[in-house]
């Protein structure tokens, strides 16, 4: 047996250990069904021998936009869409940080990162999409086939009536139809991809409704009709379930619902619509806390799930089959929590995994999709007085016009919340310009037994000044192919928290699998105006000898514009305390004091970080052996950034005190507030070692 086969068997064994007996039984049955479906595969050779022609019966598309919608799009938003569309006509498009220049005639199977091309004729359920050696970087391959570039081109046609955009959409779609027949190749291996693709197809047809060639591209083309049915048959037959029912099941249900409403052309359409609506409503509630925070505790996926939920809800409403008030209430909570978490630059937290997934693209791509989400939510559920005010964009105007009305949602906060107790997320922040923004993590590890998109980041903090990352969450960087990097970016030492005895708080069993979950709880959250204080603890080190509990308190003094961080650890253990900085921050270390500086308009930013003197501190940047000192601005990208690492031993009753003070010219430092706890001199620093 090959090494890869042995590794694969090991993965299956570890994965099965995270499942219930019922899920194991269902997955066995699912594998049997997948094998039994192999005769249903349609190859490209078979497709070439088949003359599909036109459908046997007349089909119509009625889910169109109201007259005058295009004229409502702001001029600046229109300009951005057309500029991006013109670049696309030249073959230029960025996918997950990679600028592609080959999109005049795209190769749907080629990975632009590795240059590898997966087998387009292989039966989908025999494609090992997790193997970078066989398919390349599968996220790159999948991303293009979500067809977001075609929804953008369709939007450009809708706003300009320029024939070039519509013709390019038609060329690419017909290419995709031909190159990706049913169950052939990598684009039929994951239901989330099919769900997103169906949403894109519905909106492409809608945006091109007045283009003379659109009916020949869709309902008069038997292959196009068959592709739309194939996608829905797949989603009905192979849903995500059990410990995998995270954002994937939301995308699958949303895509099925959108397609069955927009293309009700098949005998199964009504059943697909009912089932997908029930599934979506159930899973939206399961996947989000009542506060609106996503249970995956991965900020980027909260935006993604909200986009999918709104896209499906709008489609259902327009088709005359609205979703329940409970679902709209939860979507409203998701929007309110999103509005509350953004910093003064409208940047979201960077908690957990991020793959920049997009539910629907009707605008020029942006690095930060959250302002667009709020603009859409403003149209659909209404903004509250305390919300930030992002500018209207093409997507919010167009989707809002299609929705037709604004929904009233219940139980909305009268002022901006700073604590989401059910999710263990608390924000300590100042008001006015040059905002100090601090996210504190004191909640569950992640969602479901594998917590696929969680990081080992309990009690970590993320601190920004005027929207600039100071103490930064390093991000995600990669999913497949670079296991050492994947493990690092998820690890405890990669976050602004404490690691004990060289172990992460939660134990990793695979790139999307955690075996043991550190559970954190908030002990106290107090905000009396000038002072805000947060205290939480976690049990991730209860299995050590002796058992250990890590408790952290963070105090924001708004008057002195400073943060104090106090770490208390039960049990005598080796400790590594890490502080990671954003790529804009320069750090100079002098024993246990670090001088921080960064560029900003006017006077450069500056801060002083007083570190626990009982630890031995070292400064790192862009190191690979071992990995340390990196920041990932997005999936597939990493840049060097400073990291401070303190090493030592701690015993009970010996807190580690850290103070971050933001400096302003002419303002004297304020003395450190008394915490009512003993000093930390009883910790001992170890000998200097070569390893980090």
Label for each model-derived stretch:
Residues 1-57:
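Membrane-proximal basic amphipathic "stem/tether" segments
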Residues 32-132, 139-144:
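Extended, charge-enriched "interface" segments that sit outside catalytic cores
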Residues 120-122, 128-335, 339, 347, ...:
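Aromatic-lined, polymer-binding surfaces characteristic
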Residues 145, 252, 334, 422-424, ...:
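Residues that flank catalytic or metal-binding motifs in active/ligand-binding sites
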Residues 195, 354, 361-365, 379, ...:
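CBM-like, beta-strand-rich accessory domains located in the C-terminal region of large
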Residues 256, 338, 428, 567, ...:
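A residue-level signal for conserved active-site and pocket-lining positions in enzyme catalytic cores
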Residues 293, 297-471, 523-528, 651:
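Carbohydrate-active enzyme catalytic cores, enriched for enzymes
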Residues 449, 471-482:
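Cytochrome P450 core scaffold surrounding the K-helix E-X-X-R motif
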